[in-house]
Amino acid sequence: PEAAVSWYRQGAERGSVRSMYELGRCCQGGIGVAEDLKQALIWFHKSAEVGDADSLGLLGWSYEYGIGTEQDYARAVEYYQCAAEKGNASSMNNLAEMLANGRGGPRNFEQAMFWYQRAAEAGSVCALYNMGWHAEQAGRIAEALDCYRQAQQSGDEAAFWALGRFYEIGIGVEQDPKQAFALYQAGAEKGNVNCRCRLIRCYALGIGTPRDPDMARQLGRALLCEKLDPWDLEDYGCQPELEQLRQLMDTLET
């Protein structure tokens, strides 16, 4: 990594846009160099000034979450918009999320759906999942199910949780606890927090699998002791799932 950083630095100093971006990524992640979030932001700004879509997207991310700078939703929207207009799929999805949730400006659901669709067409699996979530909230269950299935088949970890809920309860499909358990288990193996919460519940209550309170306690303690990423906690449904898990663990520990 150190050698790569040296090459990136030389390239960046000569004006290579890609080198500026890669050097920023190294500074942001502490790869081959000491982590320096503010320096990462400087390099992203330099490459964004000449129109690099990836850098524009990462600037949006940095301002959305306050990484190396003060959190600023309005600026995040600006950078996501610029990157999205240059065809950056993840920025299209992130812009849609900001618009759908009214971050950085008034909520604009119509524009959000436009960018979700564009993002999905550009290959964003997250956008498929997000479209499914909003369709579910609006009561368009068949549409939600279709989006979730497409996202799950493409490997989106959150879609395993969404589909698992549908099979557990019987929403738009025939109720199938075993299928729900299998989906939660697969999503948990990918690290999805919501799936991990549901998997623990399955073991505790015997949903789709033999009841195993010891396994539930073991997995529950591990999850509740973990320091979770802030963006994991912002996933749709994550806070309610964690709250239900805490209540379940109180019951299991007594």
Each model region followed by its residue ranges:
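Short helix-capping/linker turns of helical repeat alpha-solenoids
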Residues: E13-S16, G29-I31, D36, E49-D52, ...
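Hydrophobic face of amphipathic alpha-helices that form TPR/SEL1-like repeat modules
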Residues: M20-G29, L56-Y65, N94-N101, G105, ...
